[in-house]
């Protein structure tokens, strides 16, 4: 496969030019206007942020993309699917309330918001996964598959289970219905090392399923409630929470890549990622820790695999922020440095598996040429 082209612009803005201007220029340079959108539905997939989280992308960025689509005669809508775990986005009504409270509405974004898998998270389409090894079919939100054109607008940041969240996670996990998310997470559930557990209760606070209680000051998981989402693993600073299935995170990564392929296959797709507010964990949390790396810039490409690889490469070259989860880990005496910012922030991850699987099944390539837009 030939190298893909990824376009990049930084966040430096001379007087009279805004970040929104630069985002529009980036998208145009990357070829968004080459897509025939006239009279067609355009799904713009993004994350509206959990209530309490402040790291998610601002709605202003979404409006730039929506306006570009409308200029080309397209009919855009913002979309995301409901979450597997309880929170403010577990059904469409609460999800829409959450989006509105976080600033996403028709005025701020210039388009409608549609929750992809319906009121209860059960409005799904079973989509074949071409060349799938782990998933022969994927359960994708119905509204997302109804669109003629698919665009992902992703906040690139760290993630406690997948290493980072970029385009492939935004597409693969994000477009899965609640049952689709369960299928991806079904490779294993966490366990507690009682000898290491300090009873700090941080894992229980992060659990979205109310599945963790404490007995004799030690965490105990109720597996009837546990969804296997892995948030508790990222929450523990002492490695007391772990997945006994050593390959579970890698299996999740590979399934996620196959779900992304199911979403994109057979229709025009375009991808944008903003590498800013690089928190160590997912925007699904009701909080966001300090950024682990400085803001880097904006990327766009027709290839989501190359896009994620370019974002990851840029992050790996960046200097860690001292007062952050990553900086604190690197400063710990005896810390085993992985020379990988994502793995040093969240050691129990295998982020390269997602890109490897996505490339293997033909979604894109990890080889890219970076073109810089001033």
Residue ranges and their predicted role:
Residues 2-61, 71-80, 85-374:
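Extended, low-polarity segments enriched in aliphatic/aromatic residues
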Residues 66-67:
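Terminal amphipathic helices with adjacent charged low-complexity linkers/tails
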């Amino acid at each position: 496969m030939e190298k893909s082209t990824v376009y990049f612009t930084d966040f430096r803005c001379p007087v009279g030019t805004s970040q929104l201007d630069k985002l529009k220029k980036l998208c145009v340079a990357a070829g968004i206007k080459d897509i025939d959108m006239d009279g067609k539905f355009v799904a713009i997939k993004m994350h509206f942020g959990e209530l309490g989280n402040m790291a998610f992308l601002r709605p202003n960025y979404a409006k730039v993309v929506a306006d570009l689509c409308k200029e080309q005669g397209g009919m855009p809508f913002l979309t995301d699917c409901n979450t597997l775990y309880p929170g403010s986005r577990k059904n469409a009504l609460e999800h829409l309330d959450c989006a509105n409270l976080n600033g996403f509405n028709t005025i701020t974004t210039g388009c409608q918001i549609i929750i992809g898998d319906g009121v209860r998270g059960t409005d799904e389409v079973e989509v074949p996964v071409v060349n799938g090894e782990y998933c022969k079919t994927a359960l994708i939100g119905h509204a997302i598959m109804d669109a003629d054109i698919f665009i992902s607008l992703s906040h690139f940041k760290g993630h406690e289970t997948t290493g980072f969240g970029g385009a492939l996670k935004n597409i693969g996990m994000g477009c899965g219905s609640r049952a689709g998310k369960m299928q991806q997470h079904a490779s294993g559930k966490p366990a507690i090392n009682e000898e290491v557990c300090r009873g700090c209760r941080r894992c229980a606070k992060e659990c979205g399923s109310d599945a963790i209680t404490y007995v004799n000051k030690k965490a105990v998981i109720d597996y009837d409630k546990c969804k296997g989402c892995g948030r508790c693993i990222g929450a523990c600073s002492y490695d007391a929470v772990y997945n006994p299935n050593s390959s579970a995170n890698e299996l999740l990564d590979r399934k996620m890549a196959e779900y992304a392929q199911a979403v994109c296959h057979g229709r025009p797709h375009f991808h944008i990622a903003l590498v800013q507010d690089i928190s160590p964990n997912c925007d699904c949390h009701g909080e966001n820790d300090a950024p682990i790396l400085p803001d880097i810039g904006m990327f766009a490409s027709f290839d989501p695999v190359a896009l994620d690889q370019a974002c990851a490469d840029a992050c790996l070259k960046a200097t860690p922020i001292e007062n952050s989860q990553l900086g604190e880990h690197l400063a710990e005496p005896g810390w085993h440095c992985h020379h990988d910012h994502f793995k040093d922030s969240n050691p129990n991850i295998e982020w390269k598996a997602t890109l490897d699987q996505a490339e293997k099944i033909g979604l894109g390539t990890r080889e890219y040429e970076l073109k810089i837009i001033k």
